[in-house]
Amino acid sequence: MKDLFQGHAKERAITRRDWIQALTAGAAALALPAGIVNAQVKRGRIDVHHHMMPPFVDLWTPRKWSPQVSLETMDKFGTETSVLSVTGLTPLYADLFYDNSERAKKLIRQMNDYGAKVASDNPKRFGFFAALPMPDVDACIKEIAYTFDTLKCDGVMMFTDTGDKWPGDPLYRPIFDELNRRKAVLFFHPSVPKCCRGLIPGTGDTTLEFDFDTTRAIVSLLNNGVLAQCPDIRIIVNHAGAAVPALSGRIKDQVRNKQGASIPGGSAGALEELRKLYFEVAHATFGPPLAAMMKLAPSTQYLWGTDYPVWPYETTVGPLYDTPMPPDVQYALDRGNAARLFPKFA
């Protein structure tokens, strides 16, 4: 079973029986109280989906936030390091970031300076992903230079849409070319596009649209050639890949071979590009999304994430007791893969 989880992407034929056996094999090691589980891991988790709520932004969250509050919660749940990013808690907040105004650009710079300060004050406990002033391409290129060269960010964060465009749009290609040149880590955070708000009365937009919009973003990158032509960007997809793993067959089957250089290898090439993505598991450690993620991608691509403080740690930690995995795969998810992406936290 170890080979089943650790094998290369081309060897990902996990049957239902395989999956049940894998869960059973890991149960003895992982169906334990949190303190015992954490004690088995010599180094704590690295959380790549962890939000900061700066004091100069009046943003509602169900939990009070400060760096100290995060540290206390991280210690409680066995997390050694968190990589901070801004949040798309509401569509309005994402709109503020992407309204292309000087006010929005100033706020983004403040956010980035704040994230850098928190990380420099706690260099072993926090990193940060810089925000970009989309959709202003020139401003984004300048912010990339500032945040990487001056602030020493650990990567960048983008929302999955800019209101009416998705990241694979040719307008944004210079941004991806620059990130590719820098071999950057890029974390996508879900948003709700203007087209798809209030579609189902009584259902919050984020319930469905966060994961559907993430899937749109990844497909836009795939079909416009960004994944194939910018191979040095390490892309992190939220929520165990959102709907990408479940829809990967449809995505590959509907790729047109005439896309040529956009997706070398046609349908087979499309699937390989999806398998190269990294998948963090915030609020997605239930059996079905984990099974889909593991069917698509090898264990080298799994990352820990919690979406704290928007969601409590328990929503990600708790379901793992019902969906255990082999200890080596659990370690890769908890820490091992992130330590490769961010060597300074190794």
Describe every region a protein language model picked out:
Residues 2-44, 48, 56-81, 113-121, ...:
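Mid-to-C-terminal alpha-helical segments outside catalytic/metal-binding sites
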Residues 60-64, 133-140, 163-170, 244, ...:
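Acidic-and-aromatic substrate-binding clefts and catalytic sites of carbohydrate-active enzymes
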Residues 259-291:
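Aromatic-anchored helix/helix-loop segment that forms the rim or "lid"
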Residues 46-50, 82-84, 128-130, 156-158, ...:
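Hydrophobic faces of well-ordered beta-strands that scaffold small-molecule active sites
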Residues 225, 233-272:
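Aromatic-lined glycan-binding groove of carbohydrate-active enzymes
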Residues 151-154, 182-184, 232, 274-277, ...:
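Glycine-enriched alpha-helix->loop->beta-strand junction motifs that scaffold or abut catalytic
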Residues 80, 88-224, 346:
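Active-site gating/metal-coordination segments in enzymes
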Residues 51, 191-192, 241, 285, ...:
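Catalytic metal-binding/acid-base residues of hydrolase active sites
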